[in-house]
Amino acid sequence: MIPIIVLIGRTNVGKSTLFNVLTKTRDALVANYPGITRDRQYGYCKLQSNKKIILIDTAGLDIKLNEIEKQAQAQTLIAIKEAHLILFLVNARDGLMPQEYEISKNIRKYQKKTILVINKIDGINEASKINEFYSLGFEKIQKISASHNQGINTLINRYLIPWISEKFKKKITENLYKDTELKKIAIKVAFIGRPNVGKSTLINGILKEERMITSNTPGTTLDSISTPIKYNYENYTLIDTAGASKKKKKINDFQRFSIIKTLQTIEKSNVILLIIDASLQTCHQDLSLADFIIHSGKGIVVVVNKCDLFNSVELKKIKELIKSKLKFLYFSKIHFISALYKKGIFQLFKSIKESYEDSKRKISTSTLIRTMHIAIKKHQPPIIKGRRIKLKYAHLGSSNPPKIIIHGNQVKYLSLPYKRYLINFFYKTLKIKGTPIQIQFKDNENPYVKNKN
């Protein structure tokens, strides 16, 4: 299970700044689904030793005292329920505010481990302003300045990493099996998408039975359901994001799309089917989900459903538009299907298997070095301070997803366009399909530089 940490506090205490520092900003996924507060953001945070957490940034709680409980239930208390750890942020410059007593009361109701984070300590000389926060009664307290990156490492090393190590002792790795055993393992396929795009209908079509409840109401499915299946002698586990049992008649509290369950499903899967509604085409949520899947390093296959609603002329325009918007997923197959009429659904398995096998592929060092040299010959790295950046050799750092390590001189000066060029070249030359690849650049240190007097 991946740890979940939520940031809560009033407006302007620096939650979003800390969120961006920890997630490196670009990992954020904005939740814009029915029933979910738009101000809540979800992101991955990678700590030292490759410890990964899900971080939630919530809306500010700047409201009247008699409305706190009502408003918090609408946006922040749901996040608190989902979280394993709470980072309660306060603003040192403002001092202790009445709302923070109310927020702390709400936190204690759920008996979640909490760290009080006193932010914006830069330029503060009044010790009394900071000391008054101790009256909130939290044992774990850390002073930081998120905007100046001050105290962040202490927060991580003193509190977050020890907490993760203690609470999540069991480490789940996908590399426990030898290559010869991979065929015996079921490929875990997650069906991800916005509410009502046809995830359950697609699984029902594959299973040829009504295993999932389907309806036109967004948010019908509440808990993830895993279903084993064998197709063409290969074992698969189909995971529907958040499903509902027939016993559940009320969906009052959860007419919402569970981002947390989606992210957890992505984490435990091998290949992700990103399902898009052709009638709605692509929107910000689809693009955000796609970006999140790429950052998670999982294989991805794009499935555009409900194509039966359009004639051939309309469908051609939709295909062109969707391919244009998803051009950053050039390494992934895009399938246009009708889950309702079972058109094109079994062609998905070929792409799923390709994606899975390519994510596990072992690429030799000689192949990577040769590919790198061909790329350099066609397009040389830029010249920095009169010297051309040199890329010397490459090797595979890890698989699932494939991670290529390139060593050279001055590689820290490589531009983003040139890095993209190399990634695209490796994709094309190595014919990698359906899985993101990562490239890490390492500067070769000159052993004589450190010995200079």
UniProtKB/Swiss-Prot annotation:
Positions with a binding annotation for GTP 1: 9-16, 57-61, 119-122
Matching InterPro entries: G_ENGA, GTP-bd, GTPase_Der, KH_dom-like, KH_dom-like_a/b, P-loop_NTPase, Small_GTP-bd
Keyword list, A-Z: GTP-binding, Nucleotide-binding, Repeat, Ribosome biogenesis
UniProt entry tagged with the keyword Membrane: no
A Pfam family the protein falls into: MMR_HSR1
Annotated family: Belongs to the TRAFAC class TrmE-Era-EngA-EngB-Septin-like GTPase superfamily. EngA (Der) GTPase family.
HAMAP family per the UniProt record, alphabetical: GTPase_Der (MF_00195)
This protein's name: GTPase Der
